[in-house]
């Protein structure tokens, strides 16, 4: 039996040395030290030995098994190191090659315009107010002087979720909610940026989802001249210092009087071109003095407080500012379009 053990040890050490990968090495481990291996068979046969021979052979078996185990561990370490070196050689980085620049992202053109508008009005003392996009019918319509059955509701096809809940059609509900929180005490001076939703068919100038920024000022002795001065300052900061604005009479249920606001064409200086369609003016937003009914419903005394409101679409501002002819470009995630603004 002693000769058999010495022979097994010699065979195992030779096969361990010949193993050229970890799988072959594991096969040797299983073949000699596994439950069905020859070392285990020798241990099972020790029952036939005399009591005097048993401890001698047991010590010999342990020595053989220990020698094989140590050889396996040493070979495994060698093979693992070889694999690491092979992998490093295959993945080696040539530090003499020029580096690859990291592709830099940039702000979406709409984000640029929205942040620019926000910064302009924050600089004039406004704060940013926000509200829910899933809105109550009351705040979206009734609190803005649009009671149920009002014909002006037909002007805005809406996405209703229930009879009293809808996706807001403008950011004006934020104005109503903010005035309500003030509990009839001024001043209020906010802008309300956010997404709005209308049941429009998507085309070059319409989208079922778009953004709005509305502004509201409520205090004592607020006049139309304050509105005009504010919007003139906005137009000059946004489109150039030599810009002017004009008011045209219009109608909005929540303001009285109401106006459409045009800015003198920044492309031709007011002489007439294809951008302004030969008029010298470009429509940019709607505005007006807050209707007394809106003030009263929000808890303000309309005899003491007055205010003005205005609303604009950042998409339209961006289209005018950057010469974009289709609103859908903003929402199609086309990198060929978006990457043009990395240099803006």
From Swiss-Prot:
Per the entry, which co-factors are needed? Answer: Mg(2+)
One Gene Ontology CC term in the entry = cytoplasm
InterPro entries according to UniProt: aa-tRNA-synth_II, aa-tRNA-synth_II/BPL/LPL, Phe-tRNA-synth_IIc_asu, Phe-tRNA_ligase_II_N, Phe_tRNA_ligase_alpha1_bac, Phenylalanyl-tRNA_Synthase, tRNA-bd_arm
Q: Which reaction does it catalyse?
A: tRNA(Phe) + L-phenylalanine + ATP = L-phenylalanyl-tRNA(Phe) + AMP + diphosphate + H(+)
Q: Where does Mg(2+) bind?
A: 256
Pfam families tied to this protein = Phe_tRNA-synt_N, tRNA-synt_2d
This entry's comment on the bound cofactor is: Binds 2 magnesium ions per tetramer.
Please indicate if the UniProt record lists Ribonucleoprotein as a keyword. no
Q: Where in the cell is it found?
A: Cytoplasm
Q: Does the keyword Nucleotide-binding apply?
A: yes
Q: What is this protein called?
A: Phenylalanine--tRNA ligase alpha subunit
| Organism whose genome encodes this protein | Anoxybacillus flavithermus (strain DSM 21510 / WK1)
